[in-house]
Amino acid sequence: MEEFKRYLELDRSQQHDFLYPLIFQEYIYALAHDHSLTTSSSLELEKAGYENNSSLLIVKRLIIHLITQMDHFGFFTNYSSQNPFLGHNTTLYSQILLEGFVVVVEIPFSIRIISSLDLEGKEIVKSHNFRSIHSIFPFLEDKFSHLNYVLDLLIPHSIHLEILVQTFRYWVKDASSLHLLRTFLHKYHNWTNLITPKKSRFSFSKQNKRFLFFFSNFHVYEYESILAFLRNQSSHLHSKSYRPFLDRIYFYEKRDHFVKVFTKYFQAILWSFKDPFMHYVRYQGKALLASKGTFLLMNKWNYYLVNFWQCYFYMWSQPGRIHINKLSNHYLELLGYLSSVGLNSSMVRNQMLENSFLIANVSKKFDMIVPIIPLIRSLSKAKFCNLLGHPISKPVWADLSDSDIIDRFGSIYRNISHYYSGSSKKMSLYRIKYIIKLSCARTLARKHKSTVRAFLKRVGSELLEEFFFEDEFIFSLTFPKASSSSGGLYRTRIWYLDIFCIHDLANYE
């Protein structure tokens, strides 16, 4: 935010209507380059050749070509033989231009956020902890335990390219920028799989993750903002997170059209939004809509969402993508956890004068458990065990040193242990530890051409325990009371604030 505010001191008339000239500025590509260095790993940069190929000289050549050539979009055509100036670097120039373009199109959104916060006298708080995936689970524990039904839906993503361009036109009215956006979208035509983690978009995400994340979030934000707008029209519980964006002309045009077509039924439709206990959570291209209402109310939400996507975004949503489940008797597959709302019963003895009696107290509890079967299936897919959960060796790691092999296996277990540290029933992690630990021993024995028993007898079993119990030792120092009792370590629930991505083994769908 501060980078945009420092570098992009634009005139008010240029903030939205004349973004295209910024593509000719060198500092735009410097910002894109710095962002790639800070957000990408060295391995990704090495594979992409970014460190070796990106330089100020290449950027200057790119800008000169954009200024002198009439065809600014020639990077996307196969004419390298006709243009000796570009030669074999057409792909590189196209990639650099794409990265600079993403920085440019982010400007209206960033300026709108900064200006709205300045008007309200608020500061931009860097709440990095709220980015953690684990931050969502305490919210679910606090809210979902009082709810009855949940709408589990898969967000439709197959939107037409021109629909996206037309929607984006309300943010950026610069025709040249829109033409460049259309060119990028048609070049990377498999962008329609942005939302769901499919293999078809893997190659695209490797080329420019920032473009991927920006337009996937923009696509989802469009319909979420309209839902928030309608929600705020019928409830006093206004959502502050959408306030900076709700004054757009686009939303009011949609609202006016909505009222014009459904004037007679507008109040009846808004009745569906009047549930004060409605909660919305989005994750991995999916969403949860939970309510304390009845099955009839959730069915109305189902009907509305399907028609909403089809009428306003021309996206077909199959009825099988939306499921209405009762929280008390159905498990939710949420971010690698199995979650449900169960009944927690307890007996309280009450004494009144000479009479004593027992009172049965029943309360709801939102419970998360480790999905052991999908985890074993993921370990089997990664060649740590077979489908029955029997550990096997990892031959591809046999050429590494002993310390590297142990460190890799230990790191995998620590990641899994951290991710599922918030589960109330973590005893199944014993089996995961057994699989990874014995797979490590089999790999080391394979490397030294020995049996597992002979290898452990020669080096001692403490060699593996040191790595696999390191996390538990640190936990016992931090929470001595929890670890002092038998099994206390596996009964205590801990949510971490540094988990920003789902572990590969947890992403088993």
Swiss-Prot record:
The protein's GO terms of the molecular function aspect are:
RNA binding
For biological process, the GO terms are: mRNA processing; RNA splicing; tRNA processing
Q: Which InterPro entries match?
A: Domain_X, Maturase_MatK, Maturase_MatK_N
Keyword Plastid listed? The answer is yes
Sorted UniProt keywords: Chloroplast, mRNA processing, Plastid, RNA-binding, tRNA processing
Query: Main localisation, per the record?
Result: plastid
Name the source's superkingdom: Eukaryota
Does the entry feature the keyword Secreted, yes or no?
no
Q: Name one Pfam family in it.
A: MatK_N
Q: Name one GO cellular component term.
A: chloroplast
- Tell me the compartments it is located in: Plastid, Chloroplast
Similarity annotation: Belongs to the intron maturase 2 family. MatK subfamily.
Job description of the protein: Usually encoded in the trnK tRNA gene intron. Probably assists in splicing its own and other chloroplast group II introns.
Spell out the protein name for this chain: Maturase K
The source organism is Hottonia palustris (Water-violet)
What are the leading ranks of the lineage?
Answer: Eukaryota, Viridiplantae, Streptophyta, Embryophyta, Tracheophyta
